[in-house]
Structure formats: structure tokens, C-alpha cells
Amino acid sequence: YPSIINILPSVNKFGGAGKNFYRLIKDVDLENYDYICFSDQDDIWYKDKIKNAIDCLVFNNANCYSSNVIAYYPSGQKNLVDKAQSQTQFDYFFEAAGPGCTYVIKKETLIEFKKFIINNKNAAQDICLHDWFLYSFARTRNYSWYIDRKPTMLYRQHENNQVGANISFKAKYKRLGLVRNKWYQKEVTKIANALADDSFVNNQLGKGYIGNLILALSFWKLRRKKADKIYILLMLILNIF
């Protein structure tokens, strides 16, 4: 369908989903579309996924949309991945708005993000997770974001998932490793620095254990899920973050 499908020329391998999506956002002409959806090749969308997302955007007068998903495994196991807890003051520094493959963004918002990553090429390319970065960009620029409790797709889990659903013990152990080796802290810091956000969180980053303790005083503002609020509190107090 050459009239509706535009295939971009092949370029060098980028080595991760983030840089691939940054390339797509920069190279695709967004002006002819009202909404832009991110997609992974190995997930299964529900038939009403896009309609449901646009209906939610219109009804809630929001700029950006994401949703819960159903993680599914080669064994046939399925689990709800719930990311639709209430947004907090600073959650965007510490997590995405759900899997990026559920994102549906109004054209005007993504065009602004496109301008940002073009004008801040080095900083943007250094941030691993495009979906987390886009959520942070939107929140710091006061674009409204709606996270839907309704699952809109099957989110396939396999060994090559860059992040994954974080449900199994193995997945949680892998995430803990990313915290302990400071990958997580570095990504938070890179996002805060790239966005030049002069917030409470950014002002504590890089201040060592004292900064962690100050962040711990506002731990309930840093994540959405109750359990994750406790996890980050412990990470800060124990100086694992």
C-alpha cells in the first residue's frame, strides 16, 4: 500500500529501541496526521485500540495517551500490567507512562518533541528509553497525559525485551541490578539535565547520600504505584539509588 505506507530507507543499526524511535520521529513528516501511535512489531493490538485511545483523548481533552496492557508469554501465561495509578508530582522523572507501544500522541505535541530532540541531539540520543523521555518532556511542558486503565493490547514477553513487564522474579531481579549498577540513577539524571528542569528532584540529583535523603522525604511524589513508592524510599535510604 504505497499510498498509505511510507518505508524509510535503511540506515545503520542503532542498537536499541530508543534510538530507532528517535530516528523515526525525526525523519517522518508528522504534519499530515492528527495522532501518532508508537508500535512494536511483535505485539498484538486489540481491534479498538486506536479508536479507544482517540476517544479518551477527546473526552479528557488530553494531549497524550497510554494504557495498561496484558503481558503474554511463550507458555501462554497472561498477566495484567497495571500502570494506570494516579500521576504524582514527579513520577515522570522516575518512570514512563506505561509501555511505549500504547502511546498515542496528538500531532502538535509530538512535533514539539521532534523539535526538541533535533535541537538537543546529543542529549536526546544519550537517553535510552524514548517512551520515558517523551512522558517526561510532556509533563515538564504541561501537556496533559491520560493513562487508561483499560488494556489495549497483548504485550509479548521474550528474552530480547529491552525493559519488559517486570512481573516475574527474574524480571524484578534484573531491574534491581539496573538500580545497583547506577543505570537507573544515570537515566533519571540524563532526563532531568536534558529537559533543564529546575525542580526539586533535579536540584537533589548529584548530591550523593544527602540528596537521596532529601528526596526520600517526598518519596510518595516520585512513583505512581504504592509498592513502587516504598521501593524507591528504601533505595534512597539505603543509598542504592
Task: Name these PLM-found stretches.
Residues 1-169:
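Nucleotide-sugar donor-binding/catalytic module of glycosyltransferases
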Residues 116-123, 154-241:
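C-terminal subregions of glycosyltransferases and related glycan-biosynthesis enzymes
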